């Protein structure tokens, strides 16, 4: 099974969640509500989950082997990094781009 599409929307907040993601597997199955989270050891992809009545979070969908988990992580982070490269600096002004 391969990740054939990644749709990512960055979140502009001060929180730990940095993006919401949908992935397509084999151009046939979509999983929504993955999240890019800033953890203590850097960014990682969290699977969609819901809160149980006792307050714990349980994954709704998740890979069952480490190879698939790594493929999802790599595909999502590649798109996340590409979007980071294209997003202009918030502090840049129109004069900065004219000088270049």
Swiss-Prot record:
Transmembrane segments: none annotated. InterPro entries: SpoVG (IPR007170), SpoVG_sf (IPR036751). Keywords: Cell cycle, Cell division, Septation. It comes from the Bacteria. One of its GO terms (biological process) is sporulation resulting in formation of a cellular spore. Belongs to the SpoVG family. Could be involved in septation. This is Putative septation protein SpoVG. It comes from Staphylococcus aureus (strain MRSA252).
